């Protein structure tokens, strides 16, 4: 005889997992569940509390998997060369990380891959027994680990290893926010790349006008003050602010002052310099200013390269991340 619609145990434990995850997040953050979902269970919008809760305009996507208890084991990790470059011989090294393994359908992983690493998708493993949540960025995991397995696409499922040190607590909130702000980081890198190309065709007489315009554009990007960002980026921020205050880059300003302190002439046009008009000589002051601005934009352009090489391996079960966090 009919007994009515049934609710499966998997649906119940899945709902429990989502509720535990929500309870771990800051109360001002907004979560939105997807029904039906096709791999992505919910999205998170980051807010900050001031006098009112204000959105930061940062979002990330989450796939939630729940179990009463996850088995932990120590994963042996071997050193490897940079996966963004052709294989190279590297110094042998070995690391060990405690991880939780979880099998995911390759169809879902391929969907995440198609979304691109500019839209971070996190896998969150919720353990009911301990009420703990562990996470890993699937977008980076696929790019830095999975696609370098020749058999990845041909398999029905793939094992993903989630480091147990990636736990959702107050420190974890900073990491989630770092992932959520990735699209604006990419927007910054793209803008700098465009500006740097333009500057290659600007002569020394127009350079300051272009720089004054460009530098105010990139300084407005809401990416510079985040605590997790690389020290290289903090250095770039400091360089930008020094220029905005003094009208010259810091290193070149020191070079000019050093020459002046030693009694040398910095204003006579007796120098030939890179990036300056090859048909006339310039002053040491002018040469330093022009070269400093090009140096600054080269430094800014390197931010995106560093991010691709290093930062997208943060919090992954890789040798590079172990080297970075232990340094």
Name what the model sees in each region.
Residues 1-6:
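A short, surface-exposed helix-loop junction/capping segment
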Residues 7-11:
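A detector for short, charged/polar N-terminal pre-domain segments
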Residues 89-186:
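Mixed-charge intrinsically disordered linker/loop segments at interdomain junctions
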Residues 37, 47, 76-80, 139, ...:
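Generic preference for flexible, low-structure residues
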Residues 19, 74, 79-82, 103, ...:
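Detector for Asparagine
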Residues 13-82:
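Catalytic centers of nucleases
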Residues 177-327:
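Long, low-complexity, intrinsically disordered terminal regions
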Residues 79-91:
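A basic- and aromatic-enriched beta-loop-alpha substructure that forms the phosphate/nucleotide-
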């Amino acid at each position: 005889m009919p007994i009515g619609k049934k609710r499966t145990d998997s649906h119940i434990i899945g709902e429990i997992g989502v509720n535990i995850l929500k309870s771990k997040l800051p109360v001002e953050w907004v979560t939105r569940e997807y029904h039906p979902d096709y791999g992505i269970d919910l999205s998170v919008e980051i807010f900050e509390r001031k006098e009112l809760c204000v959105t930061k305009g940062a979002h990330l996507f989450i796939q939630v998997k729940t179990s009463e208890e996850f088995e932990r084991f120590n994963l042996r990790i071997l050193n490897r060369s940079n996966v963004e470059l052709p294989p190279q011989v590297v110094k042998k090294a070995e690391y060990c990380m405690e991880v939780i393994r979880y099998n995911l359908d390759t169809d879902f992983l391929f969907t995440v891959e198609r979304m691109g690493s500019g839209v971070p998708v996190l896998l969150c493993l919720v353990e009911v027994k301990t009420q703990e949540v562990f996470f890993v960025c699937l977008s980076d995991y696929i790019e830095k680990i999975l696609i370098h397995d020749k058999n990845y696409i041909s398999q029905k499922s793939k094992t993903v290893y989630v480091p147990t040190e990636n736990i959702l607590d107050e420190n974890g909130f900073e990491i989630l926010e770092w992932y959520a702000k990735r699209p604006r980081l990419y927007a910054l890198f793209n803008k700098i790349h465009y500006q740097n190309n333009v500057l290659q065709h600007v002569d020394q007489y127009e350079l300051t006008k272009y720089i004054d315009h460009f530098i105010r554009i990139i300084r407005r990007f809401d990416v510079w003050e985040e605590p997790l960002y690389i020290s290289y980026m903090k250095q770039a921020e400091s360089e930008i602010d020094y220029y905005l205050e003094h009208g010259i880059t810091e290193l070149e300003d020191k070079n000019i002052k050093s020459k002046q302190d030693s009694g040398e002439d910095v204003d006579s046009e007796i120098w030939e310099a890179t990036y300056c008009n090859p048909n006339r000589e310039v002053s040491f002051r002018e040469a330093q200013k022009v070269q400093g601005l090009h140096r600054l934009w080269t430094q800014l352009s390197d931010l995106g390269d560093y991010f691709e090489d290093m930062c997208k391996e943060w919090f992954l079960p890789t040798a590079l991340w172990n080297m970075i966090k232990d340094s």
